[in-house]
Amino acid sequence: MKLRNNETTFLHDPNQTVFDIPSVQFFNDNVMNPCQESTWNFLEIVISHLKSVHDKYNGFHKIIHLGGDEVGHLTYSGDEKFPWENFPSCVEMIENNKNDATNSWDKGTPTEFNELQWYFTAKFMKIVKVLLDSF
């Protein structure tokens, strides 16, 4: 898969310092950051590539399992914490959005960490739909 020129596809916040964020399966560091544009660039590239591969075999399946429903919110110390609370870009996004009562995850402006999973899923579904409809 060839990455597009001059596009950032980092999945990590460059200012992130905590990496021992376990999943419910106890894998570390497997959570995408929905608060930075590079995550969305990466996902667009992956979906476009999947689409092009499947097109060679009589069409792309219109069902994609997004996963993510098991994003954990427990640290190894047992403290409940959403993984995105460790991402400086998400902390900044929530801080910027939470003081405006008109903001909400479904408008693309989540105001709480527990809304980021819904925000991620909704935005990813829109990207998938646009990419699938464009082929």
Task: Describe the residue ranges of each PLM region.
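Aromatic-lined carbohydrate-binding surfaces of glycoside hydrolases
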Residues: M1-M125
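Short, compositionally biased segments
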Residues: V130-F135
